[in-house]
């Protein structure tokens, strides 16, 4: 399995860089950037590993003796370690810019051992630094760069951005009866494209996407010449799998979501990301079809989704119009899901230690 790596600059990003000489060569010059400890802990909980990459002009020279560098540097590493934050590697270029070496950022020599391993998840690994040279380094190793700016884009902002990009999944399921391809982004809104061949079902999934705040790409091809059963069932299975995988790390999750009556149809939905599949479905429809969708498949869709997502779901609706009832169910589920997947902290939302 490929590893998510954050290649992080030191001076100006992890710790303050002195403006007078740009050297952290004494304990009293060591100052951590705001929110750095809590942010790295949160990112670590999402499976990230850290590599420090730093240019230290003239390290080992008379103007910057290595022993002067080592004291605050190892003190810094020990503080990180005391909070459970471990750097897998510390890569240091000791040269001046005029030395024209091939290891000074944005050159890539220091990182070649990491790149040769071919075990980096390039879609979800980043270079983080405060300088343009850090962004150039990111480009040179084909990773996304995130520039730290203390007043405009600090560690809280960086952490939110990484987690937002991290909660993405793509799942494809192909059988003799259907082909289902789903991509979703839990923290990206209003970028959905849904095509199942069932117009009313498309409309319901669009409502789910809008009200959950989850962008969805859904392409479903099934044996609609027979009926809509396999297409709707397998869409529910794959959507549940994609949501479950995107929520693989549940640290900080709200976990629970609920909505009370909405619209004239009085839809209720209660959700628990419990890892225990269970569905309580209370709805009665007057007609066999709404548009081109069989109303019997509404419950079966939620059942398929519950089983593959491994959630506990209670949904209830009352109303006179089948269209409004079904639509309010999807809206209510979306609203409840929005609350349940929201990140509110750093800890696992259970006393069991596993979810």
UniProtKB/Swiss-Prot annotation:
EC number: 3.1.3.15, 4.2.1.19
Biological processes, Gene Ontology terms: L-histidine biosynthetic process
Binding site for Mg(2+): 9, 11, 130
Molecular function via GO: histidinol-phosphatase activity; imidazoleglycerol-phosphate dehydratase activity; metal ion binding
UniProt binding sites for Zn(2+): 93, 95, 101, 103
Pathway the protein takes part in: Amino-acid biosynthesis; L-histidine biosynthesis; L-histidine from 5-phospho-alpha-D-ribose 1-diphosphate: step 6/9; Amino-acid biosynthesis; L-histidine biosynthesis; L-histidine from 5-phospho-alpha-D-ribose 1-diphosphate: step 8/9
Protein name: Histidine biosynthesis bifunctional protein HisB
Species this chain originates from: Buchnera aphidicola subsp. Schizaphis graminum (strain Sg)
């Amino acid at each position: 399995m490929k590893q998510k790596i954050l290649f992080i600059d030191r001076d100006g990003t992890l710790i303050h860089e002195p403006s007078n000489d740009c050297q952290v060569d004494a304990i009293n010059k060591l100052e951590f950037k705001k929110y750095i400890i809590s942010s790295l802990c949160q990112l670590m909980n999402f499976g990230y590993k850290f590599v420090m990459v730093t240019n230290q002009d003239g390290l080992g020279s008379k103007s910057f003796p290595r022993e002067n560098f080592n004291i605050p540097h190892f003190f810094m590493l020990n503080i990180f370690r005391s909070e459970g934050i471990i750097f897998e590697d510390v890569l240091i270029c000791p040269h001046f810019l005029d030395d024209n070496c091939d290891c000074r950022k944005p050159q890539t020599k220091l990182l070649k051992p990491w790149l040769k391993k071919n075990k980096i998840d390039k879609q979800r690994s980043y270079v983080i630094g405060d300088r343009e040279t850090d962004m150039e380094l990111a480009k040179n190793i084909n990773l996304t760069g995130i520039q730290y700016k203390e007043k405009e884009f600090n560690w809280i902002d960086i952490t939110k951005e990484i987690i937002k990009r991290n909660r993405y999944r793509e799942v494809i399921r192909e059988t003799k009866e259907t082909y289902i391809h789903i991509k979703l982004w839990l923290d990206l809104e209003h970028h959905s494209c849904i095509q199942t061949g069932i117009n009313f079902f498309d409309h319901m999934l669009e409502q789910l996407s809008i009200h959950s705040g989850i962008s969805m790409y859904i392409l479903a091809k099934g044996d609609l010449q027979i009926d809509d059963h396999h297409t709707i069932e397998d869409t529910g299975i794959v959507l549940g799998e994609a949501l479950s995988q995107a929520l693989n790390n549940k640290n900080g999750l709200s976990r629970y979501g609920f909505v009370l009556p909405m619209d004239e149809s009085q839809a209720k939905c209660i959700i628990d990301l419990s890892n225990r599949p269970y569905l309580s479905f209370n709805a009665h429809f007057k007609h066999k079809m709404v548009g081109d969708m069989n109303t019997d498949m509404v419950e079966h869709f939620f059942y398929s989704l519950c089983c593959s997502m491994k959630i506990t779901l209670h949904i209830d609706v009352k109303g006179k119009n089948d269209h409004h009832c079904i639509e309010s169910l999807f809206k209510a589920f979306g609203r409840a899901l929005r609350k349940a997947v929201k990140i509110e902290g750093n800890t696992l939302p259970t006393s069991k230690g596993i979810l």
